[in-house]
């Protein structure tokens, strides 16, 4: 039996909802049990756990009505949806550290992305256990596929990174380097992440299946929208061009060159004069980091919003 892309898409919602809601698994992961020796019944069939993470995706309250996302709809229809959920941190690595440890950034110490800014640190595997370590402790095989961005793995300069995340509790990762979400990486590399995940699941099917597995799949998109040069001038007007990543116009292929009719938000014309000062400061800093973008340029802002919709659609098909 081979797992295809269609099989993965069909099974996402069911696999995620049944695995994550298993009472026996939830009981095993209680804080009081984490430091105890594993006493699971090896003869009992335990659920495999599939975690799927997308990068820089926001709540879907403001998407255009004609944008259909069938894979995400299957999740909504077959799982628990947290409509009032708020993330613990906006930045990539701090937010990801919360997801994979269950601890706030005050505990993970990741206040910035590893390698960027004074005082930026890596996630410490012995101080803040990850889901990989917790599931290993109760007898699971573990694998992580895709964007990591929680430690400076690339600094190790290894030709094969397949075992580079073992200190964090994941038996297997990927041969190539970590990807920090650079320009076009979602469009160009998410399909490779999926293929790597399919290969892992196919290999598990070839074994006797007595040991359950935890597989975390971490896609880039809709992160590609971060590096869109929406007016053709942003890349050249950045304070430090090329910092972290280059910026580039939309890819000239569907869905990235398509207009989804994504309208401007009702707050578009707000001059921020009645808002907290931090909002204006954030806008000012964005002009330096992402280059000059006129806040009143409706066409450029529509390009950003429609490119985000395109990233979502491409991600949904992946």
Predicted regions and their residues:
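Formylglycine-dependent sulfatase
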Residues: 3, 7-16, 23, 29-318
């Amino acid at each position: 039996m081979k797992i295809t892309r269609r099989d993965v898409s069909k099974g996402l919602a069911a696999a995620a909802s049944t695995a994550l809601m298993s009472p026996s698994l939830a009981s095993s992961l209680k804080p009081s049990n984490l430091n105890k020796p594993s006493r699971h019944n090896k003869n009992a069939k335990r659920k495999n756990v599939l975690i799927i993470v997308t990068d820089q995706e926001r709540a879907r309250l403001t998407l255009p009505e004609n944008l259909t996302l069938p894979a995400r709809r299957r999740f909504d229809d077959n799982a628990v949806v947290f409509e009032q959920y708020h993330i613990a941190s906006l930045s990539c690595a701090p937010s990801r550290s919360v997801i994979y440890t269950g601890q706030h950034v005050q505990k993970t110490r990741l206040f910035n992305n590893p390698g960027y800014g004074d005082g930026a640190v890596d996630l410490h595997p012995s101080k803040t256990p990850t889901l990989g370590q917790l599931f290993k402790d109760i007898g699971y095989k573990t694998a992580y596929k895709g964007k990591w961005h929680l430690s400076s793995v690339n600094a190790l300069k290894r030709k094969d990174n397949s075992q580079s995340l073992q200190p964090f509790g994941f038996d297997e990762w990927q041969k190539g380097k970590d990807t920090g979400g650079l320009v076009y990486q979602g469009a160009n590399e998410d399909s490779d992440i999926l293929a790597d995940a399919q290969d892992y699941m196919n290999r598990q099917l070839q074994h006797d299946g007595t040991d359950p597995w935890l597989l975390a799949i971490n896609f880039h998109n809709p992160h590609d929208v971060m590096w869109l040069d929406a007016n053709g001038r942003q890349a050249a007007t950045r304070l430090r061009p090329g910092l972290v990543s280059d910026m580039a116009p939309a890819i000239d292929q569907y869905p990235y060159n398509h207009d989804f009719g994504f309208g401007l938000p009702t707050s578009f014309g707000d001059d921020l004069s009645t808002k907290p000062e931090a909002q204006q400061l954030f806008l000012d800093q964005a002009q330096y980091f992402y280059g000059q973008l006129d806040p009143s340029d409706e066409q450029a802002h529509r390009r950003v919003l429609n490119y985000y919709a395109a990233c979502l659609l491409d991600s949904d098909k992946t």
